[in-house]
């Protein structure tokens, strides 16, 4: 099995989402499993007009600048395709995702790679038979409330890619009771089969 762990918190030290994702990885990893690790804060992901326009033209028509921009996108898509299990840790920043996580999703959304258009115009995700775990933390936002724009969006994006098995581990409203939130998230991790 290949496990793809993606951390998106801007905080390297003292990040609750990173710490919980590490606990989850230790819980589900079996001897012989391979881990692909991606720290989105290290990559400084960025989507420009060049990237966006390059996604709409055939590879043979792309400039050298387009091709260079696609090296990272190709790598992200490859990591997703290779993996059986995906762990994404993300704090809620201003009610939504970290900018690097949004850019990761934009760079991974590739026609013919992670999704395709069917003859009727509807989209179909191409990344089937994968399990995703979302480790979501927040200071004050209640998960799945009208203020949480991260969790439903990220679940939608993964479904869009074809990943239908998505489980959420949450440590929300940590500013109100940090210990309680962390313990509840740790219990959710312990209960994963």
From Swiss-Prot:
First-level EC class = oxidoreductase
Chemical reaction(s) catalysed: 2 a quinone + NADH + H(+) = 2 a 1,4-benzosemiquinone + NAD(+); N,N-dimethyl-1,4-phenylenediamine + anthranilate + 2 NAD(+) = 2-(4-dimethylaminophenyl)diazenylbenzoate + 2 NADH + 2 H(+)
EC assignment? 1.6.5.-, 1.7.1.17
A GO molecular function term, named singly, is: oxidoreductase activity, acting on NAD(P)H as acceptor
Question: One short Pfam family name for this protein?
Answer: Flavodoxin_2
Cofactor(s) this protein cannot do without: FMN
Presence of the UniProt keyword DNA-binding in the record = no
Keywords, ordered alphabetically: Flavoprotein, FMN, NAD, Oxidoreductase
InterPro entries from the entry?
Flavodoxin_fold, Flavoprotein-like_sf, FMN-dep_NADH:Q_OxRdtase_AzoR1, NADH:quinone_OxRdtase_FMN_depd
Q: How does it assemble?
A: Homodimer.
Q: What does this protein do?
A: Quinone reductase that provides resistance to thiol-specific stress caused by electrophilic quinones. Also exhibits azoreductase activity. Catalyzes the reductive cleavage of the azo bond in aromatic azo compounds to the corresponding amines.
What protein family is recorded?
Belongs to the azoreductase type 1 family.
Q: What is this protein called?
A: FMN-dependent NADH:quinone oxidoreductase
Q: Species name for this entry?
A: Pelagibacter ubique (strain HTCC1062)
């Amino acid at each position: 099995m290949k496990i793809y762990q993606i951390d998106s918190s801007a905080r390297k030290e003292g990040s609750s989402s990173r710490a919980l994702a590490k606990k989850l990885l230790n819980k589900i990893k079996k001897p012989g499993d391979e881990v692909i690790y991606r720290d989105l804060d290290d990559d400084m992901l960025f989507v420009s007009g060049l990237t966006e326009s390059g996604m709409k033209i055939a590879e043979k028509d792309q400039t050298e600048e387009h091709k260079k921009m696609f090296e990272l996108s190709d790598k992200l898509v490859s990591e997703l395709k290779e993996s059986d299990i995906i762990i994404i840790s993300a704090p809620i920043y201003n009610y939504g995702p970290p900018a690097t996580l949004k850019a990761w999703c934009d760079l991974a959304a590739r026609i013919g790679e992670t999704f395709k258009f069917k003859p009727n115009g509807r989209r179909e995700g191409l990344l089937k038979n994968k399990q995703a775990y979302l480790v979501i933390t927040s200071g004050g936002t209640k998960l799945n409330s009208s203020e949480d724009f991260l969790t439903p969006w990220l679940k939608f994006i993964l479904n869009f890619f074809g990943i239908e098995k998505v489980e959420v581990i949450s440590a929300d409203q940590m500013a109100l009771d940090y210990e309680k939130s962390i313990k509840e998230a740790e219990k959710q991790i312990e209960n994963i089969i």
